């Protein structure tokens, strides 16, 4: 918040930063408390005259959190930021790849530090789109590029995609590999699906799972 107050949140709950509850969320509360000034400094750098809250979206990863993936084998837990939003009447998503933050933190990383994938998604052609997503996700599932940066070889869970539709609306979803999927509907690389009235959100809700995020 503009006054420096910090809340941590995941999909199921939200709470005020409290070091007495440092053990919750696999130690995420304690981690944020220890790095509180880092987040405040970054928020001030983004907008030191802000009147609205800033939210940092990210994945809390490391030993004891995820199971069976490469990122769970890195030496310590880390927070990987993949989106930043300024709240308010008209929320703004920031291009955080251009934030010239000069105070590095070994346990906080921006996801763009590990490269990215680009795709011109045609939601009118579900079959082709799923095939394109599957090909990229398969490569990540076979070898997690983030874990590899930390000297660990192991499988990846999936890819978080973000972008804008033809109307300029921001969209984001996670496409998981076959080893991590819990299908909500018909799912294969060649699904028999017809979209007469394309609806991106319905498409995502049908074929993809929501990503697990922690944000503050």
PLM segments and residue spans:
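Core nucleotide-handling region used for phosphoryl-transfer chemistry
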Residues: 1-216
């Amino acid at each position: 918040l503009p006054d420096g107050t910090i809340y941590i949140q995941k999909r199921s709950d939200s709470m005020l930063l409290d070091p007495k509850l440092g053990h919750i969320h696999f130690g995420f509360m304690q981690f944020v408390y220890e790095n509180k000034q880092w987040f405040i400094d970054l928020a001030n750098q983004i907008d030191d005259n802000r009147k609205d809250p800033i939210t940092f979206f990210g994945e809390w990863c490391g030993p004891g959190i995820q199971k069976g993936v490469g990122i769970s084998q890195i030496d310590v837990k880390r927070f990987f930021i993949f989106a930043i939003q300024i709240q308010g009447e008209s929320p703004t998503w920031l291009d955080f790849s251009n934030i010239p933050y000069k105070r590095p933190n070994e346990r906080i990383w921006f996801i763009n530090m590990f490269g990215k994938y680009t795709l011109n998604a045609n939601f009118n052609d579900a079959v082709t789109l799923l095939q394109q997503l599957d090909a990229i996700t398969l490569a990540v599932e076979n070898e997690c590029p983030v874990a590899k940066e930390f000297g660990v070889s192991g499988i990846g869970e999936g890819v978080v995609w973000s972008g804008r539709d033809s109307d300029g609306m921001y969209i984001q979803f996670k496409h998981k590999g076959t080893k991590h999927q819990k299908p909500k509907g018909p799912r294969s690389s060649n699904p028999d699906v017809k979209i007469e009235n394309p609806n991106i959100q319905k498409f995502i809700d049908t074929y993809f799972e929501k990503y697990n995020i922690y944000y503050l």
